[in-house]
Amino acid sequence: VLSPADKTNIKSTWDKIGGHAGDYGGEALDRTFQSFPTTKTYFPHFDLSPGSAQVKAHGKKVADALTTAVAHLDDLPGALSALSDLHAYKLRVDPVNFKLLSHCLLVTLACHHPTEFTPAVHASLDKFFAAVSTVLTSKYR
């Protein structure tokens, strides 16, 4: 459960990210593919070389979904229902991959915003990504 302090940290951090969210999403996907090569199996039709246009475009989709989630912190299941359906029923993404991407998102944000990435912000973002992952995998059960 996200506390009021968590919600403040998440919204504040996302505001600071601003127009870079799509770039960071692409970078986090690059990190995920490089660090956890098994995640590439879901993208056989993509050019998975670092910085490819397809990875950047999908990273922007990830970032846009997270931006939607940030705007609906009190109703993540409602805000992400269609995305949950897509990943569970059509794409059938192994739930562990959400944890791997979440880790890479945290690393990417910490690299770009080291001053703002305090222990409290880190904890809040970790809880947020875990909550999003839980929603995205909720229809697997």
UniProtKB/Swiss-Prot annotation:
Keywords: Acetylation, Heme, Iron, Metal-binding, Oxygen transport, Phosphoprotein, Transport
Sequence ranges assigned to domain Globin in this UniProt record: 1-141
Entry's transmembrane regions: none
GO molecular function: heme binding; iron ion binding; oxygen binding; oxygen carrier activity
Summary of the tissues where the protein is detected: Red blood cells.
Gene3D superfamilies listed in its UniProt record: Globins
Entry GO terms, CC: haptoglobin-hemoglobin complex; hemoglobin complex
Residues recorded as bearing N6-succinyllysine in the entry: K7, K11, K16, K40
Documented effect of changing A130T: In second chain
Annotated signal peptide: none
Any one of the GO BP annotations: cellular oxidant detoxification
Entry-annotated residues carrying Phosphothreonine: T8, T108, T134, T137
Keyword Oxidoreductase in record: no
InterPro entries in the record: Globin, Globin-like_sf, Globin/Proto, Hemoglobin_a-typ, Hemoglobin_oxygen_transport, Hemoglobin_pi
Subunit structure: Heterotetramer of two alpha chains and two beta chains.
Other remarks in the entry: The sequence shown is one of two non-allelic alpha chains from dog.
Protein name: Hemoglobin subunit alpha
Species, as recorded: Canis lupus familiaris
